[in-house]
Amino acid sequence: MSFKDIQGQDRAIGLLRRALDRDKVHHAYLFIGPDGIGKKKTALEMAKALNCRQPGPEGGCDSCASCLKIAKNCHPDLVHLKPEKTQITIDQIRELEDQLAYPPFGGRYRLILLDKASDLNVWAANAFLKTLEEPPSGNIFALLVNDPGELLPTLVSRCLRLNFSPLSPDLISRLLITDLGSDPEKAQVISRVSGGSLGRAYHLFEKFSEEKSWDKNLESWLRQLESLSLGRLSPLIAGVKDWLGSREQMQEALEIGSTCLRDILWLRNGLEDLVFLPAKHKERLKGLAFRYPERTWLKGYDLITQAALDLLRQVNPQLTWEMLWINMARAAH
């Protein structure tokens, strides 16, 4: 892979390539944009270009020892800072500082990649700020975020911002067909609900193809939404246990919920051709669509979006789910 293989990010990659060509790479970059649109791939290609023994116009050569090690994520000068459980801690930053005290092992530069920089807790973020203010030579930082508002403003100010754009539905649809062999109709539907994220589109394609993996979660959502009409909170709160799990599992559950409400809104407005969920659920969705005013479902969609943001910000998961359903019940009555 090289820079040219990263789809839909010509502007961000163009800025980065010009800096590499002129040997004027900034010490810290902030890659901004939704997940699944090429930020991490771009950071890895930057690591290749910085340390490749035979770099070309498209970055690394993909054949030298350095490029191959980076591709396999085993290069000693590629430091991937990941959260311990749910957060990047101050102890991890201190370990990183010890590592940065030494020059790069085998390449010109060491690249420190924070795949989810928003996972820095407040103590780690403040400690990391000192590192960015006085960066040891030979070290480049790449911080990946959905929104710069997720970070301390002082951290953002130390970085050069590169904005990554959501991909167009046409591009996502074409890639689903060529890369995964999707039929055109399914590719078109998935591309419309992917939010411009190729990673999410691939994920939806796989989950949709393995329909059983969605059924349990979807059944929980339909049951909860049907329980709204009872006007009682106890069954709604009791149902929260179905969704408590890892952060990835909870985000997937919210993704299914947002898809469910989106389909309800499509059905309510007579746009059946835009419905994403399997046809066997259509009658239950139709039954829900006209049970409440449209504003109830619009409010519900916003509440799910807010719950997903709360989980990203480390809000207590059980509290997040409980407040979601309390507010959904309020919106319904």
Indicate residue ranges for each PLM-predicted region:
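Clamp-loader machinery-focused feature within the broader ASCE/P-loop NTPase space
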Residues: 2-123
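Short capping loops/turns at secondary-structure boundaries
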Residues: 86, 118-121, 144, 148, ...
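Conserved catalytic/switch belt of AAA+ P-loop NTPases
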Residues: 101, 126-143
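Catalytic acidic motif of RecA-like/P-loop NTPases
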Residues: 115-121, 126-133, 149
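Charged, glycine-rich active-site and insertion segments that engage polyanionic ligands
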Residues: 1-48, 66-69, 137-139, 147-256, ...
